[in-house]
């Protein structure tokens, strides 16, 4: 629990020029780390300039990978309040895992509204969300960045958040309210400096940035190259 992937991944790596099978890989680590990496990239790119309170729900392997990647790119002396939703012993285990980072102040909360309230960045990595995570839209503060890694439970936010960003339009074009998004762009447009990451620190932004198959291949290629040198 907490560090065992809920989904198992295997990967076949081929040489594109010849069709030769190079490797059959257990891709659990690749899946969780590339997902964590793209989520951390979205946070680093799209968060408000004053973000200091980060909320996490769903504290399994994907959330752990996201925190690991986020800590690798945020300033090590930046004070961070990290709010965790209590579930079994996962919140306490998550906090213990990152206890060596003295700039982190962990707070465990007991309900969804407390997690959302006053959070600058909200990361959801739950695998199931049968209903809306937080129906009170007023609790999503101005400037909040919402990162639903597994996409579920935030349909109400699709309707009133100022901007929706995704790594691939195809990932979200089938969403119920896609045609009612106030504004939509792909993250690549931001990374290529075609559009600004934020128009203001009061914009509410959702980042459906969950990773592409190309990221899996990129990771697998570098792992294969290192093992076969």
Question: Predicted regions: what is each one?
Answer:
Residues 104-179:
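Rossmann-like adenosine-cofactor binding region
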Residues 39, 50-71, 85-90:
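Glycine-rich adenosine-cofactor-binding loop
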Residues 153, 157-229:
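Adenosine-phosphate binding glycine-rich loop
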Residues 46-53, 77-78, 141-142:
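Short helix-loop-beta connector
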Residues 73-98:
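NAD(P)-binding Rossmann-fold cofactor-contacting core
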């Amino acid at each position: 629990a907490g560090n065992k992937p809920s989904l198992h991944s295997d990967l076949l790596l081929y040489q594109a020029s010849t069709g030769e099978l190079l490797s059959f890989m257990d891709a659990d680590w690749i899946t969780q780390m590339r997902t964590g990496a793209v989520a951390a990239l979205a946070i680093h790119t799209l968060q408000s300039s004053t973000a200091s309170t980060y909320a996490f729900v769903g504290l399994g392997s994907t959330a752990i990978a996201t925190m690991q990647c986020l800590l690798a790119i945020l300033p090590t002396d930046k004070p961070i309040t990290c709010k965790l939703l209590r579930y079994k012993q996962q919140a306490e285990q998550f906090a213990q895992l990152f206890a060596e980072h003295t700039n982190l102040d962990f707070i465990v909360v007991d309900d969804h509204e407390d997690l959302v309230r006053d959070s600058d960045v909200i990361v959801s990595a739950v695998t199931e969300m049968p209903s809306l995570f937080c129906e009170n839209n007023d609790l999503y503060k101005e400037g909040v960045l919402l990162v639903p890694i597994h996409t579920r439970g935030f349909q109400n936010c699709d309707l009133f958040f100022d901007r929706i960003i995704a790594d691939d339009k195809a990932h979200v074009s089938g969403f119920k309210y896609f045609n009612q998004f106030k504004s939509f762009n792909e993250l690549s447009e931001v990374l290529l400096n075609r559009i600004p990451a934020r128009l203001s620190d009061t914009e509410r932004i959702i980042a459906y940035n969950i990773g592409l198959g190309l990221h899996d291949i990129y990771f697998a290629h570098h792992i294969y190259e290192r093992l076969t040198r």
